[in-house]
């Protein structure tokens, strides 16, 4: 038995992709997500290609997945796509310990984050 089909929550001109369990803090991931919010998909890919942030590789992979979802699943025009939303959420936090002096220990927090990218097809503006 399969699960019942859910209604599509996004409008017909949007597609999304989600990347979970990214091993980076949400604060650092949000710095890269701010680069692509509101930009055209091609320009956002170029920005991520030449970004020096380590997590930009994973953000680029998620954006490419959203573009592929728009093209293959929803029949949207790739050239007219804009990154409408880029949400960053908190994931789990792995806790490790580091031995310190005098038999004490220090905590090391290894945070994870989640990224949701929504791309929208915009209509070409008619120039007069």
Swiss-Prot record:
Entries under CDD domains matching the protein: Ribosomal_L22 (cd00336)
Any Pfam family matching the protein: Ribosomal_L22
InterPro entries referenced in this protein's UniProt entry, alphabetically: Ribosomal_uL22, Ribosomal_uL22_bac/chlpt-type, Ribosomal_uL22_bac/org-type, Ribosomal_uL22_sf
Keyword hit for Transmembrane: no
GO biological process: translation
Top-rank taxon: Bacteria
Signal sequence segment: none
Annotated family: Belongs to the universal ribosomal protein uL22 family.
Purpose: This protein binds specifically to 23S rRNA; its binding is stimulated by other ribosomal proteins, e.g. L4, L17, and L20. It is important during the early stages of 50S assembly. It makes multiple contacts with different domains of the 23S rRNA in the assembled 50S subunit and ribosome.
Subunit structure, interactors included: Part of the 50S ribosomal subunit.
The protein's name: Large ribosomal subunit protein uL22
Source organism phylogeny: Bacteria, Pseudomonadati, Pseudomonadota, Alphaproteobacteria, Hyphomicrobiales
């Amino acid at each position: 038995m399969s699960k019942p089909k859910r209604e599509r929550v996004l409008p017909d001109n949007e597609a999304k992709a989600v990347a979970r369990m990214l091993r980076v803090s949400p604060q650092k991931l949000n710095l890269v997500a701010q680069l692509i919010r509101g930009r055209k998909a091609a320009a956002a890919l170029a920005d991520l290609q030449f970004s020096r942030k380590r997590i930009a590789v994973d953000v680029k992979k998620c954006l490419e997945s959203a573009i592929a979802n728009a093209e293959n699943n929803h029949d949207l025009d790739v050239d007219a796509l804009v990154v409408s939303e880029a949400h960053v959420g908190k994931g789990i936090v792995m806790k490790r310990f580091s031995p310190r002096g005098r038999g004490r220990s220090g905590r090391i927090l290894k945070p994870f984050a989640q990224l949701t990218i929504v791309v929208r097809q915009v209509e070409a503006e008619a120039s007069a």
